[in-house]
Regions:
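Acidic, glycine-rich flexible loop segments
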Residues: 54-135
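Residues in flexible loops and secondary-structure boundaries
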Residues: 39-44, 105-107, 154
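Predominantly extracellular/secreted and cell-surface proteins with exposed
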Residues: 1-91
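Edge beta-strand at a domain terminus
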Residues: 28-38, 125-158
């Protein structure tokens, strides 16, 4: 998974990126992000689509308290084109990506902490949901959630 995100304010944020992965059923997925989600929904601000350096979830009062408190180097909300086995599934997938502090325990991937905000930032989470009014994906639960550990981020050269 490789992406670039620009946090340029509430109306100028931008994203570009591609993720490719294979699910347990052998399906090959490709997600291509090319535009941000800017519209906030209740209790879930999107900060113009991209935000850098945000403590949220858990006890922060930002987004859901039902998951650990994390430190996110970058969080973004975008729309994307999604392909399954090279066949277009949707041009309007709703995507949320975070490069965040480590939350998972080695070996079984269970949550390792409730306040994970001081852990090393080395985890990428990718959540892909059907667009509004679209059918569920042909995947367990109807959506995709991919987690990469031991990930790194880099600041682009100015």
């Amino acid at each position: 998974f490789s992406f670039t995100a620009w946090d340029l304010g509430a109306v100028r944020d931008s994203v570009a990126g591609v993720a490719e992965f294979t699910t347990q059923d052998g399906a090959r997925w490709r997600m291509v992000m090319d535009r941000v989600q800017t519209r906030d929904v209740p209790h879930h601000p999107r900060f113009g689509g991209v935000i850098m350096g945000l403590y949220y979830h858990g006890v922060t009062g930002v987004h859901t308290p039902l998951v650990p408190t994390i430190n996110s180097a970058v969080a973004l909300w975008s729309f994307a084109h999604l392909y399954r086995n090279d066949v277009l599934v949707t041009d309007n997938a709703a995507v949320h990506v975070m490069l965040l502090s480590h939350t998972r325990r080695e070996g079984d991937f269970a949550l390792e902490c409730w306040d994970c905000s001081r852990n090393k930032i080395d985890e990428v989470q990718l959540q892909i949901l059907p667009g509004t009014g679209e059918p569920k994906f042909n995947a367990p639960g109807g959506f995709l959630f991919v987690n990469w550990e031991h990930s790194v981020g880099a600041q682009p050269a100015s």
